[in-house]
Amino acid sequence: MDKAAFRTAFGAVYEHSPWLAEEVFDTGVDAILVDADALNARFESVFLAAGKPRQLAVLQAHPQLACARAEQTELTAASRREQTGAGLDQCTEAEFNQFIDMNEKYMNKNNFPFIIAVKGRNRQQILEAFKSRLDNDTSSEFQTALEQVCQIAKFRIKDILRG
């Protein structure tokens, strides 16, 4: 697989950040292309070594939760599938308003959106996690967001390799 094909296949693993796929490719990926765990570890290593400014840019590229219901156009296909799979497109009006309010508070406080790997969770679990993290300090949330982005990437890599 050449670099362009790798970027096409894996460029959306980290939200709106195809540069990560390019840098992962440059580390040499031929031996790990069929091993989801090894490929994920390589992506995670490159992401965590990228430095705080680039990490923050990746976090800021993530959509706010429940935006699938709001029909936001900047939502990637992967994010739309994930949010829809968690039922975030089926929020009641009250739940939707909670997400809108918490999204705004969280973003104003931290300068990046609330990020959680929604796969395998329902909207009530996501709302509870959101509520429990609202009062955390920004440094803790930055670390948690990095972990969650890596978890999202792991799910996406596995999905891509399953075909």
Predicted regions and their residues:
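Charge-rich, low-complexity N-terminal segments
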Residues: 9-32
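Non-catalytic terminal and connector segments of soluble metabolic enzymes
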Residues: 4-11, 21, 44-45, 73-74
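Aromatic-anchored, charged helix-turn/loop surface patch used as a conserved interaction hotspot
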Residues: 25-102, 152-161
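C-terminal non-catalytic interaction appendages of large macromolecular assemblies
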Residues: 91, 95, 99-163
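Amphipathic alpha-helical interaction elements
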Residues: 12, 29, 47-48, 115, ...
